[in-house]
Amino acid sequence: MRNRLILVAAVFSILGLTIQSSNAGSVNELSEAESAAGFEALFNGRNLDNGWEHKGNWKAENGVVTREGKGGSLVYKAKKIPDDFELKFQWKVAKGSNSGVYYRPGQYEYQILDNGVHNDGKNPRTSAASLYFCMAPSHDATKPVGEWNEGRIVCKGTIIQHWLNGKKVIHFDYSDSKWKFNIDMLEKRGAKLPARGAHLSLQDHGDPVWYRAIKLRTLPADEKLDVKKVEPAKIAADVLEAERKKLEGIVNRRKK
């Protein structure tokens, strides 16, 4: 009887691993709708051999990309990001973790963060899904730490959109003089607004982070964007002062 119970437990364990592996693989594959829309899967769910470069500190495991030590960002070198594009990805963090997705030359970063613990979560302009140190999301749409979030970046012309878990949280047109202060912040950090042709980069910030379902497509010239505007979250006065000092430090370090 005992041997039979052990055998049954082993079978269920194997089935569980198989189901887990199957589910992990399926999220990295293109759906029919994604294929029809022109998406390309950048991560195959098995390894990082299809164009990803790193210094031995990233790995693919159980259908997920994760870092396993310091060494720098994970960069997709097989092709550059198109001028007008849509990028989808899933991400999750551990308690206090920080990472980011870089998608245009300079400091265009979709912030990846545990808002509740990391210090950057105190400032909406550096919180999860922000255009880091430029534009705050309209609200905190993150899921609890340890759960998967769905990120999405849409860029066409001068319009930049950040989405999180199905909600558009940033709609930013950098040709609009309304956002001059925000644009100045981005440029001080090194972003070149008209520049295009970056390689997708997943930031190593020294913290545990996981990515999967990384999918990219070129936006057709005749495709219309969701133009509904969203307003960035308000930032408290004391947080703005801390932000000013932090930006000053960043600028000074860049001068050295």
Tell where the protein language model's regions lie, with residue ranges.
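Bacterial N-terminal signal peptides that target proteins for export
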Residues: 1-9
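Bacterial N-terminal signal peptides
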Residues: 8-18
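Carbohydrate-interacting regions of secretory-pathway proteins
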Residues: 21-256
